[in-house]
Amino acid sequence: MDDFSSISLLSLAMLVGCYVSGIIPLAVNFSEEKLKLVTVLGAGLLCGTALAVIVPEGVHALYEEVLEAKHHDMGDIHKAKDAETGAEISAAHEHDHSNLHAYIGVSLVLGFVFMLLVDQIGSSHMHSADDPEAARAASSKITTTLGLVVHAAADGVALGAAASTSQTSVQLIVFVAIMLHKAPAAFGLVSFLMHAGLERNRIRKHLLVFALAAPVLSMLTYLGLSKSSKEALSEVNATGVAMLFSAGTFLYVATVHVLPEVGGMGHSHKPEVGATKGLSRLEVCALVLGCLIPLVLSIGHQH
């Protein structure tokens, strides 16, 4: 199968898988208590996915080429038995590794700061509304969706860059990594929007935009890359950088929007019953379970 057919199939699978997993909370009618529990589980899935799947996958993609090159060079050293050459090569690898460490931090921080700026710009436009609380809630819904769409778009670029390397194994690894977190993310996004009180038709539109972002960007990236730019991309390891940038956006959405929103849900329930602000024990268990599920899935998906 040629690269174009494989990237088309992977994009289609990504679109269908993401949309179907996002529809699940909409298809089932939850009571208010159960919806809260599902929302907390979704928040846990978003956080666990960011930390246990996306960051490690991005780091792995970044280091993969260097480790392979090092492996080949070590073989050459053993053949040559030349101590001086060996020292030079190991020094070059130390330099490579220090560069890669910088890439990791810069990509994560840029993703986080990018979403922070988008959030501030979005909320500054919203503050002119009469009801500041309603404006904040509306801004939160938009930012959450926008953050996940930006994240999905960066995923799409990563998959498109991986497809342009013509290595099926790299494509499949990136695809599996993306699917492992897109399904929980779609579930988390829809349950969060349901809790925020968005109408079902609008939730479906948000979900469709999120589901389309990665497939469309992966196709555009693959088709838009010329041969020379493909070589340049493989040199700077665009797949790893794009995944880490998307991890930064994902972390922002999970920690700054979804978690505080979920943590502050206690006050929306029967205020007279008592000051049960924060989460109940069952909700804490659901949150922890949500964080652990992506971890277990990622352990099962060994390279």
UniProtKB/Swiss-Prot annotation:
InterPro entries, alphabetized: ZIP, ZIP9
Location of this chain's protein in the cell: Golgi apparatus, trans-Golgi network membrane; Cell membrane; Cytoplasm, Perinuclear region; Mitochondrion
Gene Ontology cellular component list: mitochondrial membrane; mitochondrion; nucleus; perinuclear region of cytoplasm; plasma membrane; trans-Golgi network
Keyword terms, alphabetized: Cell membrane, Cytoplasm, Glycoprotein, Golgi apparatus, Ion transport, Membrane, Mitochondrion, Nucleus, Transmembrane, Transmembrane helix, Transport, Zinc, Zinc transport
GO terms for biological process, alphabetical: bicellular tight junction assembly; intracellular zinc ion homeostasis; regulation of cellular response to testosterone stimulus; regulation of vascular endothelial cell proliferation; zinc ion transmembrane transport
Glycan-modified residues: 29, 237
Top-level division of the source organism's lineage: Eukaryota
Pfam families: Zip
Catalytic activity: Zn(2+)(in) = Zn(2+)(out)
Bilayer topology annotation: Multi-pass membrane protein
Coiled-coil residue spans: none
MF-aspect GO terms: androgen binding; G protein-coupled receptor activity; zinc efflux transmembrane transporter activity; zinc ion transmembrane transporter activity
Regions that span the bilayer: 7-27, 35-55, 102-122, 142-162, 172-192, 206-226, 240-260, 282-302
Disulfide linkage: none
Family label: Belongs to the ZIP transporter (TC 2.A.5) family.
Function text: Transports zinc ions across cell and organelle membranes into the cytoplasm and regulates intracellular zinc homeostasis. Participates in the zinc ions efflux out of the secretory compartments. Also functions as a membrane androgen receptor that mediates, through a G protein, the non-classical androgen signaling pathway, characterized by the activation of MAPK3/MAPK1 (Erk1/2) and transcription factors CREB1 or ATF1.
Protein name: Zinc transporter ZIP9
Record organism: Xenopus tropicalis
